Amino acid sequence: MAISRGDKVRIRRPESYWFNEVGTVASIDTSGIRYPVVVRFEKVNYNGFSGVDGGINTNNFAEAELDPA
């Protein structure tokens, strides 16, 4: 599967906060790291302070954990 920057992908990592969610590929690292694909999402996760907007909206994934959306 060839994933490139800007593609919409569905997350297939069961333990991920974004499991089965759709995100956009922000970048792909070619240096050989374990999780080279950075995916950006519309919503943020649960990391943040109470009453304050914030959290993380990107995460790294392996290509095998992504399906085209």
UniProtKB/Swiss-Prot annotation:
GO terms for cellular component: photosystem I reaction center; plasma membrane-derived thylakoid membrane. One of its GO terms (biological process) is photosynthesis. SUPFAM superfamilies: Electron transport accessory proteins. Its main location: membrane. Pfam families: PSI_PsaE. The keyword Membrane applies. It is a peripheral membrane protein. It is found in: Cellular thylakoid membrane. Keywords: Membrane, Photosynthesis, Photosystem I, Thylakoid. InterPro entries: Elect_transpt_acc-like_dom_sf, PSI_PsaE. Gene3D superfamilies: 2.30.30.50. Belongs to the PsaE family. Stabilizes the interaction between PsaC and the PSI core, assists the docking of the ferredoxin to PSI and interacts with ferredoxin-NADP oxidoreductase. HAMAP family: PSI_PsaE (MF_00613). This is Photosystem I reaction center subunit IV. It comes from Synechococcus sp. (strain RCC307). The lineage of its organism: Bacteria, Bacillati, Cyanobacteriota, Cyanophyceae, Synechococcales.
